[in-house]
Swiss-Prot record:
Annotated residues for binding of [2Fe-2S] cluster: 97, 128, 188, 260
Subunit and partners: Homodimer.
InterPro entries the record matches: Aldolase_TIM (IPR013785), BATS_dom (IPR010722), Biotin_synth/BioAB (IPR002684), Biotin_synthase (IPR024177), Elp3/MiaA/NifB-like_rSAM (IPR006638), rSAM (IPR007197)
Enzyme class: transferase
Segments forming domain Radical SAM core: 38-262
Annotated organism of origin: Granulibacter bethesdensis (strain ATCC BAA-1260 / CGDNIH1)
PROSITE patterns: RADICAL_SAM
UniProt protein name: Biotin synthase
Cofactor: [4Fe-4S] cluster; [2Fe-2S] cluster
Record function comment: Catalyzes the conversion of dethiobiotin (DTB) to biotin by the insertion of a sulfur atom into dethiobiotin via a radical-based mechanism.
């Protein structure tokens, strides 16, 4: 199988436009060649520092400038975070992800975050954090603490990005991804559907991800969760078939990545999620909350995966 980093927008758009059965057939064939299609990797996500963010991401309820009812909190204590990690492991999660609503981490907080990472690793779990923009030295410190994955999404295409965020550039995001990669940390990077973008923008997001020097090890695909008080409240919801198409094209263009169903899954039917798994999704977030928005209950996920004959890893 040839791994490519030279996808054109026209090629990706042609994949998105394929007849649905043909697209799923191609994606499923690649998925089976690279993974056991019965396995789903489970991650749990915890907000270790909520709200008060100075950024203006139009989808985000944690932005300080939007009145969304999210109260700003301080960075959690290490022992409280590790208690949550133990509970996540007991529930079946193999990776514990920690998110902080920062533009970038302050040096005074790095020691605490590194201690959290070390504690999660000591539990025998994979660790992931999302802390905003990083310097090269901060990325190295996280690596030294044992960090496995760093999440930093591109969100949308380079062309549409300015309609969603003005407080950091696309190049800022790419620079952080380069620091993470140079430090030897696995990259978790994806995007969000339902921001008002067009099909060309969705193709542009895939091109930006698939043409990185190395494909992300993890690619979260989110459907916008609309929150009252954010500028994107009232957007047209993403069509289910269009969402599945993006999962399939992510699988085709990034064969060895874990493609994760992320935000927005609570609103999906079991049948929609089954189509996503058929199209190549093989990771989900587990637990009733993703940072500040809802997520399916663990019992519902276990029941669905059991019905589908799939297993957690």
């Amino acid at each position: 199988m040839v791994i490519r980093h030279d996808w054109s927008r026209e090629e990706v758009r042609s994949l998105l436009d394929l007849p649905f059965p043909e697209l799923l057939f191609r994606a499923a064939a690649i998925h089976r060649a690279c993974f056991d299609p019965r396995e789903v990797q489970i991650s749990t996500l915890l907000s270790i520092k909520t709200g008060g963010c100075p950024e203006d991401c139009a989808y985000c309820p944690q932005a300080a400038q939007y009145d969304t009812g999210v109260e700003a909190s301080r960075l959690m204590r290490v022992d409280a975070v590790l208690e949550e990690a133990r509970a996540a492991k007991a529930a079946g999660a193999s990776r514990f992800c920690m998110g902080a609503a920062w533009r970038s981490p302050k040096e005074r907080d790095m020691d605490t975050v590194c201690e959290m990472i070390e504690g999660v690793k000591a539990l025998g779990m994979e660790s992931c954090v999302t802390l905003g923009m990083l310097t090269d030295q901060q990325a190295l410190r996280l690596k030294q603490a044992g960090l496995d994955y760093y999440n930093h999404n591109l969100d949308t295409s380079p062309e549409y990005y300015g309609a969603v965020i003005s407080t950091r550039t696309y190049e800022d995001r790419l620079e952080t991804l380069a620091h993470v990669r140079d430090a030897g940390i696995n990259v978790c990077c994806g995007g969000i559907l339902g921001l008002g973008e067009g099909l060309d923008d969705r193709a542009g997001l895939i091109v930006a991800l698939a043409n990185l020097p190395r494909h992300p090890e993890s690619v979260p695909i989110n459907a916008l969760v609309q929150v009252e008080g954010t500028p994107l409240k009232g957007q047209e919801p993403v069509d289910t078939i269009d969402f599945v198409r993006m999962i399939a094209v992510a699988r085709i263009t990034m064969p060895h990545a874990r493609v994760r169903l992320s935000a927005g899954r609570e609103a999906m039917t079991d049948e929609a999620q089954a189509l996503c798994f058929l199209a190549g999704a093989n990771s989900i977030f587990y637990g009733e909350k993703l940072l500040t928005t809802g997520n399916p209950a663990a019992e519902r996920d276990r029941a669905l995966l059991s019905r589908l004959g799939m297993r957690l890893v």
